[in-house]
A protein has these predicted regions:
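Conserved alpha/beta-hydrolase catalytic His-Asp/Glu region
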Residues: 127, 134-180
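Short beta-strand element of the alpha/beta-hydrolase
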Residues: 22-31
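Flexible "cap/lid" loop of the alpha/beta hydrolase fold
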Residues: 101-146
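Active-site loop/oxyanion-hole signature of alpha/beta-hydrolase fold enzymes
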Residues: 3-15, 40-48, 52-98
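Active-site glycine-rich loops that stabilize anionic/oxyanionic intermediates
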Residues: 31-34, 97
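Alpha/beta-hydrolase active-site loop signature
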Residues: 33, 58-62, 124
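Active-site acidic short loop of glycosyltransferases
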Residues: 22, 87-90, 111-112
Length: 180
């Protein structure tokens, strides 16, 4: 699904299904440098069980246009505007990493929009390591590789996945490189 919000074309995954905001809505909130792709399997799981799932790419991420937002408050306001633009009265939020911080801010300022919230790998403070910032400035590919190592650990290099031909390391690297 594509829509225009704040003069930017926004992409939102609906799992290939028609979206009905009057049904039980699950809104997935991605983290920094991520996109709707990070929730593909979860999205499919809930969509096939009667939930109305939607996963927008924030401005400057994934398939969405526009400048990336720079504060958690601005991101929470953006999600509230997104929900209002689609006529979503209330949603269960599922946020990953920074997405969890966005959920907290959204629930704090727009409690009527939030039915429930689930948090995946979230903390109240998520500072970016100075070594990672320096590495990204010097060698973007090496910084992405380091993030994949930290995120998946040694087992991630085995490429063991329940879906043949799928690698979390490759998938994650391509996702991060696409948003760099």
């Amino acid at each position: 699904m594509r829509l225009t919000l704040n003069n930017a074309e926004i992409f939102a995954s609906t799992g290939g299904r028609d979206f009905d905001p009057s049904g039980p809505v699950v809104l997935f909130v991605h983290g920094s440098g991520q996109s709707h792709l990070g929730f593909m399997l979860q999205h499919r799981f809930f969509a096939n069980r009667g939930f109305q799932c939607i996963t927008p790419d924030m401005p400057g991420h994934g398939l969405s246009k526009g400048e990336a937002l720079t504060t958690i408050k601005a991101m929470a306001d953006w999600y509230a505007q997104f929900m209002q633009a689609l006529g979503i009265p209330k949603a269960t939020l599922v946020g990953h990493s920074m997405g969890g911080l966005i959920e907290l801010e959204l629930a704090s300022h727009y409690p009527d929009l939030v039915a429930k919230a689930a948090f995946i790998s979230t903390a109240l403070a998520i500072p970016v390591n100075d070594a990672l910032i320096n590495l990204a400035a010097a060698k973007e590919g090496a910084a992405i590789g380091a993030m994949m190592d930290w995120g998946h650990g040694a087992a991630g290099h085995i490429h063991d996945h329940t879906m043949p031909g799928t690698s979390h390391m490759l998938y994650g690297s391509r996702l991060m490189a696409g948003n760099a």
